[in-house]
Amino acid sequence: MDFKENRHYANKYGVELNEYLKHNFNYEELVGWYTMQVLKYLVRAGKKEGESYGKDYKKALDYAKELANLSNDNELTEYTTDDIMGFIQGMADDFEQWKGEE
């Protein structure tokens, strides 16, 4: 997802939501946000009527790229987008097998 291309996420001043989040939330909060977005789109991929698997997977990948950039920009880790997608795909797989509270 090109955040600058998706103008439906901009306010009346043209500021993108993604830029607002980066300015107003700390590193840990942003990691949580991006992780949940990747997880959401991986779980949803191929299930939402009118949305292809590929479209949702690409959205997950775009958020994973943002997460990798965030981590690398903060020089805390050196994760690749593939690392992140693999890790969060594992979470999505766990969710698909989860039967709820046991």
Located regions from the model:
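Intrinsically disordered, low-complexity regulatory regions
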Residues: M1-E102
